């Protein structure tokens, strides 16, 4: 699909979704995070996000307690097609901000992505825009965009603030959704 038609699809889906009632908006602000998470990310550790982290972690989606979440959902959405998740995700950040994420399972790389990033000198967070999303929706056609802020907390855990927008047609109905979630993943033991 040509990139110039993406804004038209988003606009059409948003208008149709608003008329039909298929709109989902969910945002988690920093003030809604668990207290322990807040103390670990303010300020984040001065080192860029790199190293190996467990693929299984926690995602905060609002007032409810955090739920299990996979790190590959943040940087490699839809790229691991089989049902067996990655064991660890290896992250590397180059001095120019280029960010690489590799999903490891059984001693081999099963998915990899390289993204342009920008290190915010004031906060220490790495900002990533336009994370490629491969649709796994079996019930319709959707277009999604995803961006993230990444930092290592004072305890060595990885924190990700991910924002996404998705629009399209699902089960013959126009749909639109947007949201922001936070995730936390422990450093993997070598």
Residue spans for each PLM region:
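Generic low-complexity segments that are intrinsically disordered, proline-rich and/or Lys/Arg-biased
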Residues: 3, 8, 35, 45-49, ...
